Amino acid sequence: MSFSFLEETALQYWAQLDCPTSLKLTILARAGAWAEVLTAKVAPEDFIDPEAFARANASVTFLKKNPFIPGFTDEDRGSACRTSWREGEASCYKANERLSPYIMHPLEDSMPAEFLRRARKILLGWLGPCPTDVDDGSLSYDVRPPLQGASLRRDERRRRTLADYARHGPGTTFSSSVANPTAADKYDDVLSLTRGSRFYLWNLTDSIWMRSLMARAARMSVDPLDCLNWSRGNRFTTVPKTAKTDRGIAIECTLNIYFQLAIGRAIRTGLRRNTGWDLDNAAAVHREVARKASVLGHYATIDLSNASDSLCTNLVRILLRGTPWLERMEDLRSTHTFMDGKWHRLEKFSSMGNGYTFELETCVFASLIAALLELDGRSALLGHDFFVFGDDIIVPTDTAESVVKALAWAGFRTNPEKTFLQGSFRESCGGDFFLGYPVRGFYLKQDLCYGTQAIYS
């Protein structure tokens, strides 16, 4: 049997690792069973030696995210991704039904209702005031204390507006006319937006962007609103994830994502100011806590499966009910997704691709965990007693099972392959540790070519 350069490289890599797992994969590969190679797994609990596990883990991870190996086709990956998306919507529907009584009767005297009220109180305390639409002259809560003897000018102390936080993201948008648009491309493109976000055009008043839009309308002799690309929602697409499945994301409208990112930055600011938990540096903290936990066993690491597609609308509405935060998020979210030629009404609150999804899900997970810990009579300081960074969660080991059950009740499933409640292995934010030793495997995600092809292909 002949092998490609990529396949030969994998065979040589496994030979160098020289362990039972790499031998098994070599036998499967030589037999042409690449699908079994790509889905092979190792369990940390089957090992007692960090080096032995590191070699076995490196064997199975090497090709796990490489789409150029035979075994699964592009159609297989796309189909698996769409199936996962539909499963997420079905899960959100069930969670919405389960939580709907707590929207209609928020003061209900029951343990679940008390749990949600406690989580809501905690979350609102973390977020603080929502940015205003325009500069209303009020003083800011988002300033660092001045140096001794210094004072802040009035314009330095004003409350930050949505426009102050807003920015373009690195990805494409619903109306982008080029494959990898820059910020300049997005300013020059036709502005796309949903009906709910139209009021946020006011935040662009007197900006270069708005003047450009007005100039375009004048050149075309049409109403400025006729120069806009109105959309019902976002558009579904996929990006590479593993050799077996793609990752589903949503491409948002230009105006929506511009201010969604503003909400996301404002949430980060609120968390940092009110809790000290800085999402800009939290991943490194997670890795260090996971490393120590793999030795001491005092913390468990939890990873949620399909987390972004599992955040149902009713949960967010319960936690943020009656606040400007919810009003702005509702305005800027997409209520529908265009996929496979038709529009789908969303049961989830926001998709991966929405500019505030990461920050929102971090806060939702953290507030639910904090409420659970407080109701159990424990301390619940984010960044001290427990840690949350997106769907990467670290909690005290003796509370882990309760946390998993509470999150499941709220509509979230743990990923059993990446959740470790006991044993000598912990994983969080890209850090894998066995008894304190880093054991994360290498992922080869690109194709390899012979000779000069590697330079020019």
Please give the residue ranges for each predicted region.
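Core nucleotidyl-transferase/polymerase catalytic module
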Residues: 1-5, 13, 212-457
